Amino acid sequence: MKRAGSRVVPALAASLALALACCAVAAPRDNINDWAWLSDIEARRRPPFRIFDNVAYVGLDWVSCYLIETSAGLILIDALYEPYTETLLDNIRALGHDPADVAYVIVTHGHWDHAGGAATLQEKLGARVVMSAADWDLVARDSSSGNTRFTPAREDLALGDGEILTLGDTTLTFHLTPGHTDGSLSVEFPARDGERTWRALTYGGVGINFSDPEKLKTYSDSVRRIMARGPFDVNLTNHPGMAWVFPLARDLAARQPGEPHPFVDPAAMAAFLKQRLAAAASS
C-alpha cells in the first residue's frame, strides 16, 4: 500500500461556507428502519473542511470523521458507516489526498455509526484498524445482530490506556474512557495552526445510553481521569453537534489574520467535561 507523505492543502473556504448548520440529532430508535434519514446520502453528506493545518473534517452532518495529515501518511478518527464509505473517500480526495495514503483508522468505540465503515476501509485501502480490546470484543459480539448490524473489520490493532501511535511527525496518545461502551477510546493528537501546536482530544464516547449506577460511576470516573490529564485545548467530538463543530467552522471561515482560532478554547473544553459529569449525576 502506498504510504506517501501527505500534502498540505489550502483551506477549502467554499466548503466551509457550506458547512454551516450544526445538527442536533436524536439517538436512533430500536428499529433502525424507522430512520430512513440515516441512509439518505445527499441529506447526510457535508463538504469536507480544514480545521487546522493538519486536521480536517471529512464526516457527515451528524457523525464525525477527522482526517489527520502526517509526514508519512494519513490517519482517520472513526470510519462512519455504510453507505457512506464512498462519501468519506470522496471527501478525502476533495482535500487533495489519495485515500490509499490512509495508514490507520482509529475507531473510538464499537457502535455501528463509528465502526460500521472500518471493514470497507480495511479492505479497499489496506489501512490498519485500531480499537480497544474491549470494543473489538463488542464488535465481534454485536455487529451481526439487530437492526444496526454491520460487517466488522478483521481484528487488527488493540491499543489501551496510555499507549501511543506514531506516524511520521505525528504521535497520537490513547486514553481508555469506558462508559458509553466498555472500551471507548479517547484520542489525543496535535492540532497545528501556523507556529502554534495545540492539544486536541476526541472523546471516545460522549453519550450516556444507560442508567445502571455502576456504569454511571465508570463513565464519571473516565471523565475525571481525562480532566486530570488535561488541560486540553481543542474539543473535536465524534458527533459534531456535541461541541458545535459546524458553527465553529463558520467562525473559522470568517477568521481574519491575527485573530484567535475559534476551535482553541481550553475553558470550553473544561466546561464540556464538567457538563458530562453533571449529566451522569442526573441520569
Can you annotate each of these PLM segments?
Residues 54, 68, 78, 109, ...:
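Divalent metal-coordination and catalytic microenvironments
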Residues 55, 83-86, 93-164, 269:
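Active-site HxH/HxHxD metal-binding segment of metal-dependent hydrolases
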